[in-house]
Amino acid sequence: MKKLLCIALAIILLVSLLPGCGQKIKEPVTFYYQITNYQENMVSPIAGEEREVTGYRDNLKYLLTFYLMGPISQELSSPLPRGTQLCGISQEGTELTIEISDTASALNDSGFSLACACLSMTCMGLTNAERVTIVSGSRSLTFASDNLLLSDTIAAKETTQ
């Protein structure tokens, strides 16, 4: 009986030491993506995915490049077209501007709004930004933290440059 108990404890110890088994995420961040099979009767088309970023928590360029690689979960999908790249980041106080490649021109207005909402929510969680502007080619969309709602009444301002 002692031998069986020792073997069981050894197995539990080994399993807890395996990556992804029993270990908590040390430096988690939440990236927001589109729910793959979103249906209109659902509350929100956006869901968060927790990711490990040990050592890079304060490196926004790294985090956004990591974000643009897309989600790990099969239940989520990137609302931005494949190949979208980070072109620039600038922050003045609580206003953050993210410039991405012009791949967003392939999206219709609602798709672009959803993509910008996901990226804005991610940025607001990573920084102290209260307003996030996403620029893609000639399109631009600004979200403020106090009026970012995930419903048909998204308070956003789209401009053409």
Where are these regions (language model features)?
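Bimodal "functional hotspot" detector
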Residues: L4-A8, G20-Q161
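Hydrophobic core
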Residues: L9, L13-L17
